């Protein structure tokens, strides 16, 4: 006979202080091992257990939920619908009223947590706060010998949800089968009168619950340290946030740096692209140059071979060139000797006669009869019958006769061999003699349209010097200009009044020089022409009966030529004296008596010197006048002399023309000693330098 326990609704609730924490784990542990057919019950979140004391059985029974569902065992089948409070008659008394394994709680809405999230170490206690969303499952019935079912705390499992959001219900058709299966597997119930077995069962449950309670107490102790851990966690969070801000600022800096580096990388990339393009171009150029280098290398090999051949040929040609230079030098020396031999055969003193043509303003003047038999003979006859019968036929022979139609170039062509002798180291003297207005200055100087002997000599000298430079000769030209006016010497290159005298050279009795004279080293033809123009402007001239601008002094231009051959250590010294004599004039017709007397006296002394040389007298009166003293080396010394005799073609000049022609004929018949070449070799170089440095030296 089954005994029935008092109805749970009749039990009173305990009046003890209630804690705010629900020990759901205790219930969950007791209900966790229920069978598949075990039910669940709804747990009110406000229901709690007392402190550390376990409630008695009656209190446990009084704390049962108001809504219970009885699952039958054996042949009893449980109703699929939950029981309601109003149907108390339907509640069947179980075999063990204390068996709470058959209890199943209803779901409730979980309250929102009031605390922030907690660390993972207390996550296992989270079920206490979210128990409303879980369901209690009855553990499987134990199979003890006494067939006493041990009540265990319920185990929380996630509550299944139906499609409509409510708990899923079993279909009605399967309820009987499930009840029959559960009845077959259900444990044997304790008899209501077996208080000992029930006591042992409750004692065993008490031990289990006590163990779980102790465990929950430990867990609660751990939960008490959670606020401190939370504060520490919040501090760590603040530190982490500060570190995060710093990291973010660092990240921003790094991002800016990344942008800068990205820009740099882009720039470098573009530069790299251009560099690659340039590299490709340079590689193409390199390949081209390499190809050219290979071709040039081959060419270099051939050129080296060719160079070696040319070097050998050059050595041979150099030896031949030295031989040719020596032969050329010797040939040049032979040419000089032969040239001057021919000049000596022609005579050391030569006379050229020139008859000037009448000017346009002189067409009304009567001319004498001039007959040219050949190039060296001229016949002069007067148109006056009385003079013609008295003087008879006048025939004169000279080295060369120039008729009025002869040009300046024709005359200089006969003079140029003497200029060549001066370059070879000989002393040359060229002077013009004749009456006033006979054309002496025109022959020596000329006019800009038709230059005379002196300007042409300058051009020939510098042209010849350039040619001699190829033969190894270097020449230096020194020039002096002076005039003899009224037997006084004047320097035409200086406006100062100087005391100038003609003196004998110490090392050579045949040489003379003029003291205190200005000597200029000529660098080019223009420089020499400038000096000649200065001298011409300083020369004394005056208007006479025979010439509007007559030279009233004897002008002497001296050019000293010093040639040096460095290889042969040879020095050649030559000189050219170009003399423009003043015109002779009858004192009776002259208005300048003193000038005329001095001019005629110097010309008369020149005639006496020529006659003394012609008669080979022991004493030659060179010192009787400044002119003859200055021309002493040219007349009787080491010199080649050329005299121009200039005559006028007019009848009124017939007497003076005859006198001039006779004087020239007497000069042409003179025999002078052979001129010697001024040549210095080796040790004589120093001596020649000393001689050439004598101030204004004439005719070395």
From Swiss-Prot:
Q: Where is this region: Required for minus-end directionality?
A: 664-668
Coiled-coil zones = 196-346
Q: Name one GO molecular function term.
A: ATP binding
Compositional bias per record (Low complexity), positions renumbered to this chain: 149-185
User: One of this protein's GO BP terms?
Assistant: meiotic spindle assembly
- Protein location: Cytoplasm, Cytoskeleton
Residues that bind ATP: 434-441
Protein's UniProt keywords contain Ubl conjugation = no
Every Kinesin motor domain range: 348-670
Phosphoserine modifications at: 94, 96
* Cellular component GO terms held in the UniProt record: centrosome; cytosol; meiotic spindle; mitotic spindle microtubule; nucleus; spindle
The record's annotation in InterPro entries points to: Kinesin-like_fam, Kinesin_motor_CS, Kinesin_motor_dom, Kinesin_motor_dom_sf, P-loop_NTPase
Q: Family assignment? A: Belongs to the TRAFAC class myosin-kinesin ATPase superfamily. Kinesin family. NCD subfamily.
Which purpose does this protein serve, as stated in its record?
Minus-end-directed microtubule-based motor protein. Has ATPase activity. Required for normal chromosomal segregation in meiosis in females, and in early mitotic divisions of the embryo.
Tell me the protein's name: Protein claret segregational
